[in-house]
Amino acid sequence: MTLFKRQWFVLVSAVSAALSVVLFPLEVFSASPNSVGGGVQQMNILQAIVLGFVQGMTEFLPISSTAHLKVVPVALGWGDPGVAFTAIIQLGSIAAVLWYFWGDLTRIIKGATRAIALKDYADYDLRLSLGIILGTIPIVFFGLLIKKLIPDFDSSPIRSLGAIAVASIVMSLLLGVGEKLGKRERDFEHLTMQDGLLMGLAQALALIPGVSRSGSTLTSGLFMGLQRETAARFSFLLGIPAITLAGLVELKDVFAEGIADGAALPLIVGVISAAIFSYMAIAGLLSFLKTQSTWVFIWYRLVFGIAILGAISAGILQNS
């Protein structure tokens, strides 16, 4: 099997596996969860593994982990696991990205520290670090603003299946335009602080369920003329502070409200499952984008959104 065919097979298989969970609900998964303190839903180990798989395989692919974590459990009759559970198992994804990019991160931090000591403000690692910091500010600002203005965001209409479907369709079209018009001239060595800020603004759009943090940043990177792999790699690095902060904030809230008996173990299993599959997704996507376009994700998002709207219209899914 050629390298192209192997890469294509891995990516399509991963996405198809995630989709199959939605399309083929099994009796063994049919039990509805009960609410647990902090907005987390009580679940069994098997459910936690499946949701960890969904989180891991969709967090770093440009198809929205939030959308799939909302749709999959609802389609399987489990109910929405909630914002808190989603944010907590993202800690597994952040562990995976830290593991994968540990060498890059240590080099960037050491380089930036050395540049500050030498007052070499033109240093590449320092500028890259500042780009990541600047890019993190928008999502932190708007995230705190939403938490302040919409305290019941977990149950707001913007988290409805219909809204998620529309967001998925819109982002598929935007990614398609970026894929078509992007010049893809600049590699990782030519990133600027301005790139960090602009991709950070795009990252803030991921606060809207269904948009996809990876999808919005990858799309903006293509519009800015970055190579596909460069846009994806920087998107991963940019996401480290945002995903970590979101997970820690929700983790604090969950522990403050208490976790019901039996809920801790599934959470831990979900985090581990998410970490394993996130690592696989990161490696697979970077390898894939070295030689291939994003059209497989564009079409997937479009079909995913249309399928949800169709299921809602047919009464198969409730627009909740």
Swiss-Prot record:
GO molecular function terms noted in the UniProt entry: undecaprenyl-diphosphatase activity
Regions that span the bilayer: 9-29, 82-102, 130-150, 161-181, 191-211, 236-256, 265-285, 296-316
Entries under InterPro entries matching the protein: UppP
Gene Ontology terms: cellular component: plasma membrane
Top-level EC class: hydrolase
UniProt main location, coarse: membrane
Membrane topology, record value: Multi-pass membrane protein
Compartments, record wording: Cell inner membrane
Pfam family, one: BacA
The entry's keywords: Antibiotic resistance, Cell inner membrane, Cell membrane, Cell shape, Cell wall biogenesis/degradation, Hydrolase, Membrane, Peptidoglycan synthesis, Transmembrane, Transmembrane helix
EC number, as in UniProt: 3.6.1.27
This protein's record includes keyword Transit peptide: no
GO BP annotations listed: cell wall organization; peptidoglycan biosynthetic process; regulation of cell shape; response to antibiotic
Keyword S-adenosyl-L-methionine recorded: no
Reaction catalysis annotation: di-trans,octa-cis-undecaprenyl diphosphate + H2O = di-trans,octa-cis-undecaprenyl phosphate + phosphate + H(+)
Note: Bacitracin is thought to be involved in the inhibition of peptidoglycan synthesis by sequestering undecaprenyl diphosphate, thereby reducing the pool of lipid carrier available.
Protein family per UniProt: Belongs to the UppP family.
Protein's job: Catalyzes the dephosphorylation of undecaprenyl diphosphate (UPP). Confers resistance to bacitracin.
UniProt protein name: Undecaprenyl-diphosphatase
